């Protein structure tokens, strides 16, 4: 598809599609719902709307968002959930029993993901690959201890979810402009992977 620059642009353009699909990850976090991109509210009734393995990231919807959640869920033609908690939320607001499905990362085996990965090693020497979404000091301390024991370099993708200034001091390398194929390469070739991420764990 072409590149869409804003909500109005994508809203006008989606008439040319037979279906619009959203899915995986915590796209329906309370903080994401207000943007109306992942809710598919920009898609007209004439276009099919599909949600695959989408996660709410919470067990309950905040009271203030219940009306909005009920509205957008009932507009989506085909719903599925990644977690049991999401399945229950959908049932509560739509009355529908939806299937529990695998995250898309689990739909391919390692050989298929390997075909997508950047072919040549990005980091030549032995390394510990860190992919942290949270800001937990004990995780960083653990990585530093692992470095002492293994003498591996620390390679980390920094500032993924928030700016963490202290992270810049404990890493040896912090590649930027990492593509999905590069990410797979960094995971595949690491001696160790340290992560607090669902997808970091799955790909490891």
Predicted regions and their residues:
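An anion/phosphate-binding loop that grips the pyrophosphate of nucleotide cofactors and donors
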Residues: 17, 76, 190
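Catalytic donor nucleotide-activated moiety binding site of glycosyltransferases and closely related
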Residues: 53-58, 90, 139-179
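A short beta-strand/loop micro-motif in the catalytic core of glycosyltransferases
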Residues: 76-83, 194
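A conserved, positively charged/aromatic
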Residues: 70-74, 187
